[in-house]
């Protein structure tokens, strides 16, 4: 036997475990920062302050880094991710709304029906200034009727009936309802991606997990409905998709843009039945829902707020033409120039919705077309708020979000950061710099990025994802091209058999 001392074979150093441990430690640190920032935004931060804007930006960067690390190599377990997101959502629910008073407007419109037996399309909260919760309503909205659809008015009426005159019970009803909508959306994202990175990307976003729930914004319901409609459209269930889009439109009118994505994707799939059923069903539901309230609803919508919001791309032309902080200092007076811009912004949103839905319709799934069409409003509108991006974020969440999804995700954070800035402070260098970046430069950059990525970035991916050009496209065990992945327990063997059966039936 050779002497063991003569064996000069080098022994490899155990480098793997330290590397894994270091990567895991970094993720735990990032997770702690993301949860801490989310909790701070939801439960501690003042409504508007430069420090809050900085925390929003830090939270966004942390969440992005964490999601990218998990996409490259998953390390965090599902339970860990769920607990982290749950902590943020819980902190958002237990604290009264801090960054928005929308909940009290919802309550006022609901109580008009449940308590005063009046229509929120023909009356305003000021007509009932003796109401138990009237003092909670923001003065800006006390003389405006409901711009929300009949489905949400009915939902708010039911909630305020159950809550009675209790302000705490009322705000908890809306906050917990939106928390439930967020949780269901995250569960559906997990069901179709099986990706903790996708959950982190969506659930720890400072807008989606913290601000949306704490404010009790009904946009969470719209985002859930848009996601469900995409899942139904992918399964060629046009009537069901139309029902969901119609009901979402009866919550907020811009939800109808999701139908543009369904129609575009159906056109590419040469599924005229899907297109017709979705359009006919959604149109019928919206018509029937609004018909009893049409005169009052039309009057309210015609007089809707035409203010330029801080994150809107129309800040630059409004400042040039009107001045006075893009006309915001003149509120409630609205100069004619802002009214013209409002109509132009709606036209731009429509053009973007149709154009980008058309460019993204070649994907295997309708998610991109529906998400692009829906997000067009938040990118182009004169009056756009951070929580409006919740309409498109769930449907764009994926194992590997597209460049378009990243643009919408980033714009959402920038809108929230701009919204958190305080009122103008003369001479504050940091504030003025952030105001210039977030309210003037960022919205224009978001429009350019959204358009370029939508036209060019998604176009390059179409050929590789089109089943005609990609014979290796995965199919689920049911034979549908993969909206929902094969459930656990139905592994590659069954998927392979399904592919063989499909191939034999086509040959």
Where are these regions (language model features)?
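Transmembrane-helix signature of polytopic, membrane-embedded enzymes
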Residues: 80, 189-207
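Transmembrane signal-anchor helices characteristic of membrane glycosylation enzymes that use polyprenol
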Residues: 31-44, 59-103, 117-120, 283-294, ...
């Amino acid at each position: 036997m050779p002497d063991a001392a003569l064996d000069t074979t080098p022994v490899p150093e155990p480098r793997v475990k330290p590397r894994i441990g270091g990567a895991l430690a970094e993720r735990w640190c990032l997770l702690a920062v993301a949860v801490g920032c989310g909790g701070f935004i939801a439960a501690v931060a003042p409504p508007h302050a430069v420090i809050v804007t900085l925390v929003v930006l830090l939270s966004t960067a942390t969440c992005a880094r964490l999601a990218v690390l998990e996409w490259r190599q998953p390390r965090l377990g599902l339970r860990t991710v769920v607990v982290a997101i749950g902590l943020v959502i819980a902190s958002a629910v237990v604290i009264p709304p801090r960054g928005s008073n929308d909940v009290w407007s919802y309550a006022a419109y609901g109580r008009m029906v449940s308590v005063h037996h009046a229509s929120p399309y023909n009356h305003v909260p000021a007509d009932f200034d003796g109401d138990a919760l009237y003092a909670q309503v923001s003065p800006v909205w006390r003389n405006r009727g409901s711009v929300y659809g009949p489905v949400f008015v009915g939902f708010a009426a039911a909630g305020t009936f159950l809550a009675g005159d209790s302000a705490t019970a009322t705000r908890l009803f809306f906050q917990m309802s939106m928390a439930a909508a967020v949780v269901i959306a995250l569960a559906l994202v997990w069901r179709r991606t099986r990706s903790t990175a996708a959950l982190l990307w969506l659930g720890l976003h400072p807008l989606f997990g913290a601000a949306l729930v704490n404010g009790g914004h009904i946009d969470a319901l719209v985002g859930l409905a848009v996601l469900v409609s995409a899942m139904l459209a992918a399964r060629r269930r046009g009537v069901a998709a139309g029902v969901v889009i119609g009901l979402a439109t009866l919550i907020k009118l811009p939800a109808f843009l999701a139908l543009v994505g369904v129609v575009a994707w159906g056109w590419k799939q040469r599924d005229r039945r899907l297109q017709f059923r979705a359009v006919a069903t959604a149109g019928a539901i919206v018509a029937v829902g609004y018909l009893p309230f049409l005169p009052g609803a039309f009057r309210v919508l015609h007089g809707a707020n035409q203010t330029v919001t801080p994150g809107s791309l129309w800040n630059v032309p409004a400042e040039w033409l009107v001045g006075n902080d893009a006309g915001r200092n003149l509120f409630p007076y609205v100069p004619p120039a802002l009214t013209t811009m409002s109509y132009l912004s709606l036209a731009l949103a429509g053009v973007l919705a149709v154009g980008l839905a058309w460019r993204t319709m070649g994907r295997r799934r309708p998610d991109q077309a529906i998400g692009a069409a829906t997000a067009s409003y938040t990118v182009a509108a004169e009056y756009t708020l951070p929580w409006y991006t919740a309409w498109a974020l769930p449907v764009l969440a994926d194992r590997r979000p597209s460049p378009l999804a990243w643009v919408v995700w980033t714009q959402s954070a920038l809108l929230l950061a701009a919204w958190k800035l305080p009122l103008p402070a003369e001479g504050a260098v940091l504030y003025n710099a952030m105001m210039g970046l977030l309210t003037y430069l960022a919205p224009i950059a978001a429009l350019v990025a959204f358009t370029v990525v939508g036209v060019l970035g998604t176009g390059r991916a179409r050929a590789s994802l089109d089943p005609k050009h990609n014979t290796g496209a995965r199919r689920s065990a049911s034979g549908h091209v993969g909206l929902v992945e094969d459930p656990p327990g139905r592994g590659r063997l069954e998927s392979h058999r399904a592919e063989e059966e499909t191939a034999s039936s086509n040959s």
